[in-house]
Amino acid sequence: MMKHLIELKELSQIDIPEGASKLETALLVGRFAHSAFPHNGDNQPSSSDPITILKEAQAGASFRCVEYSHLAAWLMMAHGLEARTLNIMTKDVATEEYGAGHVVVEFYEGEEHGWVMADIQAGVVARYETKLQSALELSQSIDVASIEGFDGKRFTEPEGMFGGDYKEWLRPYLYFLDRSPKLNYEYFIDPEPHLILVPDGDSPPKYFQRTHKLDLVTVASDIFYCV
């Protein structure tokens, strides 16, 4: 695995200043991954590992939110951060045919911010008061949270993206939160059931968009967000 991480760092050539904090490092990686390729919700790489994603992106390919997040999470890992991809899904994910899921990244910043959600496709993080938000925190604070770019500036939705209102676009996706117990190099190879956070009174979905059977274990938030 270390060999892959070294190759990924060398291929990406992200300029991380000496002494950069975990947060600064994560945001620089996020900016790189966000700008690595144009978004195309219907295009997939020939293989789901991050080196293939980056090589094909450098050759001009465009990919989905999945590839933005998988690339960014592994680049964060390559630069010494704890990171993972997070599948966020709407309440009706089991019955919708399309557009019921989105993929983001969470990285562990430390004592000040804890786990931080970064939407690599959008190029943003969320903040409530002074604290950057995890996906779970944002599901509760989204009405009042601010959305900012990886450069710390206020986020302005690109024309034609996110329906012109990113928070309202994102809101329904924060219903189910699902992650693998560990970050896998090949995105689609998960030998273990995923962990999922389910709102009180509901149950985990059995399918993703009608066709893909889900293998999920419901856990408490302290387990989901353990370090």
Describe every region a protein language model picked out.
Residues 1-63:
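Secondary-structure boundary elements
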Residues 1-4, 22, 131, 135-137, ...:
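Intrinsic-disorder-associated interaction segments
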Residues 17-25, 57-68, 96-97, 127-130, ...:
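Extracytoplasmic/periplasmic, Sec-exported soluble proteins
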Residues 32-39, 67-71, 75, 79:
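Long, hydrophobic/aromatic-enriched structural stretches that serve as scaffold segments
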Residues 40-41, 77, 118, 172:
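Enriched - but not universal
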Residues 40-43, 87, 184:
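Detector for Asparagine
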Residues 70-146:
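Hydrophobic/aromatic-rich core segments of domains that either
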Residues 141-227:
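Alpha-helical and coiled-coil interaction segments, frequently adjacent to or embedded
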